[in-house]
């Protein structure tokens, strides 16, 4: 099993994470809290009360875990295609796989990624939702002192299953949308690349960016449910399950609640995934 795809996925994912985490923090706040009037209001309040560092809450743990999560995504995707088509990454330009194979490989990568991602994503969301202002004399300390303390607190207060809160919604989110992600990327690359050649840097950037947007527009409704399920149980249980969360959210906030965060998701998705795919492609070409 080639390991280059796993290593390239790790490095490219880390670059994309650093670029996109501030957008992700705003998105999570908009989905789980009703105190903000919109994206700009959320950004202003985060900066005013928590300083610039507020946008990077919860990032240290994803940086540490991205080695596992993105390696699984890109590694499983590429190696599933290897099994389905008997072609390596470089050979696929001359012998492009079918879109069905691409979709199946993407869904496989998304499904396995979700199980690796679930505990890390839960901790990230909990830390991002800490709205305490920057440290001042006499101010109360935040509930969680950091990712390790957060993980230990969840385990102690909610049990081992608590670390996988929202995992079912995460799996339903990632399995089909990662298939969409790779189909969009490959389709755009093929459209604007001469047959048998590698796509140009500009093509990779544009294809990666639009692949990110397409997948996140499809993912946003379940992403909202996932975020709310992850915050459920922090103080008291509100939802009986994913279906109850969906029904309660519609009843209280209307159908529009499912697309809360879609604008910030799209704004984040283009640059993050453009950089992710560009670094991924160039690392694999460099390794030959």
Curated annotation (Swiss-Prot):
One of its GO terms (molecular function) is transmembrane transporter activity. PANTHER family: MITOCHONDRIAL BASIC AMINO ACIDS TRANSPORTER-RELATED (PTHR45624), SOLUTE CARRIER FAMILY 25 MEMBER 45 (PTHR45624:SF6). Its main location: mitochondrion. Solcar repeats lie at residues 1-83, 97-191, 199-286. GO terms for cellular component: mitochondrial inner membrane; mitochondrion. The keyword Transmembrane applies. The gene is SLC25A45. It is found in: Mitochondrion inner membrane. Belongs to the mitochondrial carrier (TC 2.A.29) family. Coiled coil: none annotated. Keywords: Membrane, Mitochondrion, Mitochondrion inner membrane, Repeat, Transmembrane, Transmembrane helix, Transport. The lineage of its organism: Eukaryota, Metazoa, Chordata, Craniata, Vertebrata. It holds the Pfam family Mito_carr. It is a multi-pass membrane protein. The chain crosses the membrane at residues 6-26, 63-83, 100-120, 166-186, 202-222, 266-286. This is Solute carrier family 25 member 45. The keyword tRNA processing does not apply.
């Amino acid at each position: 099993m080639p390991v280059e795809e796993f290593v390239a996925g790790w490095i490219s994912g880390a670059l994309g994470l650093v670029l996109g985490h501030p957008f992700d923090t705003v998105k999570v706040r908009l989905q789980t809290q009703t105190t903000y009037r919109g994206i700009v209001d959320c950004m202003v309040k985060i900066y005013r009360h928590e300083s610039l560092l507020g946008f990077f809450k919860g990032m240290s743990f994803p940086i540490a875990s991205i080695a596992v999560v993105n390696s699984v995504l890109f590694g499983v995707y590429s190696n599933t295609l290897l099994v389905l088509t008997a072609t390596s990454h470089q050979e696929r330009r001359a012998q492009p796989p079918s879109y069905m194979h691409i979709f199946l490989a993407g869904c496989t990568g998304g499904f396995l990624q979700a199980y690796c991602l679930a505990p890390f994503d839960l901790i990230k969301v909990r830390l991002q939702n800490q709205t305490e202002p920057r440290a001042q004399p006499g101010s109360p300390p935040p509930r969680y002192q950091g990712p390790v303390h957060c993980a230990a607190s969840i385990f102690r207060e909610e049990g081992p299953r608590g670390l996988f809160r929202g995992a079912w919604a995460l799996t339903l989110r990632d399995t089909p949308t990662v298939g969409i992600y790779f189909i969009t990327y490959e389709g755009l690359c093929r459209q604007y690349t001469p047959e048998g050649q590698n796509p140009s840097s500009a093509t990779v950037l544009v294809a990666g960016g639009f692949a990110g947007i397409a997948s996140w527009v499809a993912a946003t409704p379940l992403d909202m449910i996932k975020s709310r399920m992850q915050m459920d149980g922090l103080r008291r249980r509100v939802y009986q399950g994913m279906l109850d969360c969906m029904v309660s959210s519609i009843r209280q906030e209307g159908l529009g609640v499912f697309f809360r965060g879609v604008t910030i998701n799209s704004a984040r998705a283009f640059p993050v995934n453009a950089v992710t795919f560009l670094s991924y492609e160039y690392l694999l070409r460099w390794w030959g």
